[in-house]
């Protein structure tokens, strides 16, 4: 796995912040693709799926105010909280859903794979579950990431 120094620094910060989490959490989207060892394209931020309880308990310790996500045609979050205190922006999301086939689909990973970096550990959905998730997002960049994950074999 080769990831950029800025992604590594951001993941290290996320791991430290979420150490007291009581519920499972995951890195998803482009950063998760990179952690699986596939080409994610541009990793502009780190998307973190977290429980609402942990978001309300942990994020205020960073001076953040968890809020309902802004309305969007394709994505929604019960809580959406951006954090700019790392090399890459981090977006914490609770009760995250995407619209596919006219229905909202809640993202609740069933798998949780630990990935160790240089002094940190984070969690991602397994490769097949991540591929299904990204396919559901349906954007061209996500479909390209699905292909890149599939190319890993």
Protein language model regions, located:
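Compositionally biased terminal segments of proteins
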Residues: 1-153
